[in-house]
């Protein structure tokens, strides 16, 4: 029964936004379940591993998640409750899509939908369609997203105020609808509804959900050209997430949030510690947005692929960040001043910067100066 208790406590930790506690609790319980095949299946191990996978996924430990869920999914199909089945299939599908395996993504969601149909579970069926709608929205396939959301809403009577089902903590019909409305530019009412949803989540201590809603709220404010309010919302989200390690909550919102985060970083990254934001978390998050292809270079439209800086251009921007003028940079790199100026023009064009100071700020936000 120890693994069942650890699993339930880990679920509560996740709902309340205590990712660090959840990881520590679940990882401590996991080795105790590593022996005894009967206990693995009968004493809650599939649910324990799936709950641990949710926590690991939030830290962007995708390989560990893939390994854990790949091992446990056959047992989960036989013995796990709907929340575990939903989480296992959706997380594995997302990891597959992130790694470029769209066929596996399609297959896992089809499997989940079939399980829901066989079990007569509207929520399981709905969850498969919610994930399809989420992916289509992020890929800017908005008509496909609308259609997937319509199918999800046919099975959405389980979403009620005050009821939280942990397999759908941050993936509900309303959250999916908010995301789609923002992508469509329908943000006036959405911004108001997000404020109300955040207040309700906060009152119930559903802080993981509140974090997701806050990021969507920042995107809605940004779309309404209320940039300062959007940056304030993002600062608050980063302040909370950086001390718990919530990484994928940000990354899963794709290029639109990545672009907003990089604009925020140009203005505020240097003051991150004073804002109560853990600098190492912020640097890692910015790098992973770029590394996963989930953030455009500043100055480009979301979804565009930026041209990377060459090794020589990175040397130039680092010397510039160190405070050196063109003449000194030329001497240190054995170049002419004309060549240095040419490199700086290329750097500004690639980073979407208007001048030297902004180029350095953007390079720092992208982790190029580390």
What are these regions (language model features)?
Residues 150-154, 231-246, 255-258, 262, ...:
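TPR/TPR-like (Sel1-like) alpha-helical repeat modules
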Residues 24-38, 70-81, 109-121, 150-163, ...:
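Amphipathic alpha-helical segments of tetratricopeptide repeats
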Residues 173, 189-216, 296-302:
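Generic long, charged, amphipathic alpha-helical segments
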């Amino acid at each position: 029964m120890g693994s069942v208790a650890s699993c339930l406590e880990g679920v509560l930790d996740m709902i309340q936004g205590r990712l660090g506690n959840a990881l520590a609790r679940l990882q401590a319980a996991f080795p105790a379940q590593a022996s005894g095949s009967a206990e693995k299946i009968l004493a809650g191990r599939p649910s324990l591993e799936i709950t641990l996978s949710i926590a690991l996924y939030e830290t962007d430990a995708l390989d560990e998640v893939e390994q854990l869920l790949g091992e446990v999914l056959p047992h989960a199909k036989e013995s796990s409750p709907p929340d575990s089945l939903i989480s296992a299939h959706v997380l594995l599908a997302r990891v597959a899509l992130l790694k470029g395996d769209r066929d596996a993504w399609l297959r896992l969601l089809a499997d989940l939908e079939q399980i829901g149909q066989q079990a007569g579970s509207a929520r399981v069926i709905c969850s498969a369609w919610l994930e399809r709608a989420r992916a289509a929205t992020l890929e800017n396939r908005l008509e496909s997203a609308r259609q997937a959301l319509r199918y999800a809403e046919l099975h959405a009577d389980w979403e009620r105020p005050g009821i939280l089902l942990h397999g759908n903590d941050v993936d509900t019909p309303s959250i999916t609808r908010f995301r789609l409305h923002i992508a469509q530019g329908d943000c006036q009412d959405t911004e108001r509804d997000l404020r109300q949803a955040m207040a309700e989540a906060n009152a119930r201590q559903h802080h993981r959900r509140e974090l997701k809603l806050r990021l969507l709220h920042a995107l809605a404010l940004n779309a309404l050209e209320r940039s300062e309010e959007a940056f304030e919302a993002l600062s608050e989200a980063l302040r909370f997430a950086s001390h718990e390690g919530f990484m994928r909550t940000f990354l899963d919102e794709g290029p639109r949030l990545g672009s907003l985060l990089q604009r925020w970083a140009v203005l505020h990254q240097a003051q991150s510690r004073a804002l109560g934001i853990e600098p190492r978390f912020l640097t890692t998050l910015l790098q992973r947005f770029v590394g996963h292809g989930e953030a455009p270079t500043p100055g480009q439209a979301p979804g565009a692929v930026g041209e990377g800086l060459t090794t020589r251009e990175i040397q130039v921007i680092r010397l510039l960040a160190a405070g050196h003028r063109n003449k000194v940079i030329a001497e240190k790199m054995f170049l002419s001043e004309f060549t240095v100026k040419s490199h700086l023009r290329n750097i500004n064009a690639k980073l979407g910067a208007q001048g030297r100071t902004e180029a350095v700020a953007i390079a720092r936000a992208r982790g190029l100066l580390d």
